[in-house]
Every structure is written in structure tokens, then in C-alpha cells.
Amino acid sequence: MKTPTIPTLLGPDGMTSLREYAGYHGGGSGFGGQLRSWNPPSESVDAALLPNFTRGNARADDLVRNNGYAANAIQLHQDHIVGSFFRLSHRPSWRYLGIGEEEARAFSREVEAAWKEFAEDDCCCIDVERKRTFTMMIREGVAMHAFNGELFVQATWDTSSSRLFRTQFRMVSPKRISNPNNTGDSRNCRAGVQINDSGAALGYYVSEDGYPGWMPQKWTWIPRELPGGRASFIHVFEPVEDGQTRGANVFYSVMEQMKMLDTLQNTQLQSAIVKAMYAATIESELDTQSAMDFILGANSQEQRERLTGWIGEIAAYYAAAPVRLGGAKVPHLMPGDSLNLQTAQDTDNGYSVFEQSLLRYIAAGLGVSYEQLSRNYAQMSYSTARASANESWAYFMGRRKFVASRQASQMFLCWLEEAIVRRVVTLPSKARFSFQEARSAWGNCDWIGSGRMAIDGLKEVQEAVMLIEAGLSTYEKECAKRGDDYQEIFAQQVRETMERRAAGLKPPAWAAAAFESGLRQSTEEEKSDSRAA
């Protein structure tokens, strides 16, 4: 007896089963089987990143060194995330520490003054190599994170110095973090990072600078933290999932397109040069067969003599009657020859549109706007420019918070510990916790970098004033958007007002208006009080 077959329900195409057709198409063969050959392996981040880690970073380095758009992308990160001065805004958690707000503000003023003296010293005492100020180190860290996906800073102690502070920092290239003797990865040592069973980093293997390459390479193990909790080696990157050991550079998703765009630009430039080389051509009556006989039969003695003789006749003729394009004389050509002037041709041929399409794709992968990446602001309205700038600003603020500020805060904590021990700054006496007991509370701070790009200065100021007047923002926030510290602005305004008054100058319009408004308001309050009485 034949077993009956159960009919299978098919999808609208009459071939795919309804169960497969009704599911997620991304996991199937796709429309027309277009996804059938696309079978990427399911891997962890380390499994996908670390086998080709060195090559990927080397390619990113090459792009930044030799590709203008890649170099501009790194410059955008530095200018918009950090700017020219990375300013400390110290904010100890005074409620948690059990101190008063005024005590906390007084302590913060002492800390900020001492930190600026140490961090922005023109002698670069903060840097082991004596090449960088603190802001320069943050700018380098942001650039390093962009094209290497991570940044490393080593906190050191200068025992031979006679300076007040012994804390120093060394910027460490990610290229120097690798397994000892370039051995393969293991469960607890991956790409130069020693980790515990939970995946937390315990220490790092740092190789010496191998240039010029004739000395044997040596590795030094540096712990992540010292026994007292002080940071010894700072490693900042943004993991995308659990178990990730090293960071992935921002160019991975657009690396192929950037390299091909480089090749395309070079080819287009060569084509334009070739077209511009020939202003005119002379065509001879020599037919194709005779020309091929000359070329293909040049190995025989007879053909070589014929070819040499023919070229000699042409050379002798034009030597006696040269062809000139810049003169007024109309030249006489050799009988049978014709002069063809080459008109200028369009070397673009749709290239600009194609380049814009590629640059938009690259800009999306790098997190910046097309206009910023290409430096092309033509045909943009105010609304379009503002929307584009706001999108990039949100990206840059995220990077400032999770990359630049993390590096800066950990460096600041190392210095603050020494400043407290040396009594350069004094903790409030009524504090509930010591520095070692509440490092994060004492070192809590914000960092003010470059301001948001102003598309229309007048409209930006009007917006800030309206937000403050409506109670939706504060002077602190609006000044921070412009890259300024509101306390410094207020203090400077007071000084300038007093100096103008001492010099017999009128106060600025805003100050006069504010004074009149305050006087009018106080007068009205006095009148209302008198009526009530």
C-alpha cells in the first residue's frame, strides 16, 4: 500500500515553502535566490577582528597618511571633539561626600587652578617625551581611537625630577600592544591583553619601539592598576558586544570604498593629463596595411630600412617646414598629411556625481556629514546645514563623553591623588570619605571641548537667549555649547564692567538694559508693597 504524501503549502512564487516564505527573508535564499551564496560565519568580535587585526590597522594608517578624505575625517574628530583647549569642570559629588556645596565649589576652584598649571604647561612636563600638553594628548588619543579603534596611555612616576608633581603620562601606540614573541592568542591572553576568566583586563604586554629594526624586540608587562587602585595603564575603546578585547577602527566599514576612490581619482587625473597633452595630431595617408607591415615586419632587415627611410623623410620635411600652432603662419604639410586640432573634451563624464555618491557612503560610515568630509557647502540652505551639523554634533558629543572624557578623567584622577597627598589641594575637613574610599566622587568632572559650529551666529544667539529666558536651559549649558566656562565668562564680565566704570565709559548695552530692567522691577515691587500696606 502506497503511503500518501502530505501536500506542502507553497508561497506566491510557487516554489518556496510557505513556512520559509513567511519567515525573515534575510535568513533565507532571498528573492530569486540572490542570497543563497551569502553565508557568513557567526563569530564573536574577537574571532572576526583579531586574526587580521594588524593588517586592518596598517591599512587604516596608510589611508590616514595618504588619503586626503581620511586625513580630514581624523582632523574633524580632533577639532569637534576636543578643540584647542580641553577645559576641566570639576564637580565633586558633595552630597555623597557629606560636604556643603560652597565647600565643594571652593575645593573645585583650587583643583582647577592647580590642574591647569600642571596640564597646560608649555614645557610639557605632563608628557614623558616632553612633546605634548594635556590637550595635545587628548587630541592624539581621539585620533588614535578613530583610526585604530582604541587608545592607550601609561601613567608613570618620574623619580629623578625636582618638579612639584612626579606624575607623568606616556602615549602608547596600539601597534606596540601584542603577545610576547608574537605568539598566538590563548584564552587568557589575546592580542597583547592579559584577561581573567570574566574578560576583565589584568595587564598589557608592551613591546619596545622596534625602529630601525636591528635590535631584538622586547616586551614589558604593565598591570592595569596598582595595588592601591591607582591606574597604571589606561585603555579606552567602545566594545560592541561581550568578550571584546581590542577596539575596531572606524574605517573598517568603508575601507574598501576609500581605497577604490583613491584609485579612481588617480585614474581620472591620468586621463585628464593624457587628453591635455596633445593639442593637435597629424594624420598621414599611410594606409592600415602599410602601417601594419612596417610595425609587424620590423624584424626583417628590409622592413627596418623602409621604416627608417620613411620616418627620415618625414623628419627632414618637418625640420625644413616646422609645424607651429602659436604663430600666424599657416604651415604646409607633407603631401597626404592632414592637421587635426584637438578640441577640449569633458574630462568629468559623470565622475563628479559618482564621487559624491561614494563620499556620502563614506561619510555615513565615519559618522560625519558629507559636507564636512568633502568640504563642499555649495547649494545648502540654512535648514539643511543646521540639520547636517546637528547630526554630526550628536556623534561628536558621544565620542567626547565615552572616549575623550574617559581618557581625561582617568589621567586627572592620577594627578589629583598626588595633589592631595602633597597638600597642593586640601580636602574639606568634614568630608565623610577619604580620596581612596571615594575616588570617583572626588574626581567627578565634566570636560568642555570645542563649541558647536555656528551656521548663523545671530540665530544661534537668539536661540540660546530664548532657551534661557524660557527656563529650558542655563548659562552653563549654553556657554558649554560654545566651548566656554560660564564661571569664567561671568567673572570676566564683572571685571570688564568695573574697569569701564573706572575709566568713565558707559556700560555695554546689555548691562544697561539689565540694570534698567532690574530697577524697574524693584520699583514696581515697592509700589505693590506700599499699596498692600
Swiss-Prot record:
<comment type="similarity">
    <text>Belongs to the siphoviridae portal protein family.</text>
</comment>
<keyword id="KW-1243">Viral long flexible tail ejection system</keyword>
<dbReference type="GO" id="GO:0099001">
    <property type="term" value="P:symbiont genome ejection through host cell envelope, long flexible tail mechanism"/>
</dbReference>
<dbReference type="InterPro" id="IPR006429">
    <property type="entry name" value="Phage_lambda_portal"/>
</dbReference>
<dbReference type="Pfam" id="PF05136">
    <property type="entry name" value="Phage_portal_2"/>
</dbReference>
<keyword id="KW-0946">Virion</keyword>
<keyword id="KW-1162">Viral penetration into host cytoplasm</keyword>
<dbReference type="GO" id="GO:0003677">
    <property type="term" value="F:DNA binding"/>
</dbReference>
<feature type="site" description="Cleavage; by viral protease">
    <location>
        <begin position="22"/>
        <end position="23"/>
    </location>
</feature>
<keyword id="KW-1188">Viral release from host cell</keyword>
<protein>
    <recommendedName>
        <fullName>Portal protein B</fullName>
    </recommendedName>
</protein>
<comment type="function">
    <text>Forms the portal vertex of the capsid. This portal plays critical roles in head assembly, genome packaging, neck/tail attachment, and genome ejection. The portal protein multimerizes as a single ring-shaped homododecamer arranged around a central channel. Binds to the terminase subunits to form the packaging machine.</text>
</comment>
<dbReference type="GO" id="GO:0019068">
    <property type="term" value="P:virion assembly"/>
</dbReference>
<comment type="subunit">
    <text>Homododecamer. Interacts with the terminase complex composed of two small and one large terminase subunits.</text>
</comment>
<dbReference type="GO" id="GO:0046798">
    <property type="term" value="C:viral portal complex"/>
</dbReference>
<keyword id="KW-0118">Viral capsid assembly</keyword>
<keyword id="KW-0231">Viral genome packaging</keyword>
<keyword id="KW-0238">DNA-binding</keyword>
<keyword id="KW-0167">Capsid protein</keyword>
<dbReference type="GO" id="GO:0005198">
    <property type="term" value="F:structural molecule activity"/>
</dbReference>
<keyword id="KW-1171">Viral genome ejection through host cell envelope</keyword>
<keyword id="KW-1160">Virus entry into host cell</keyword>
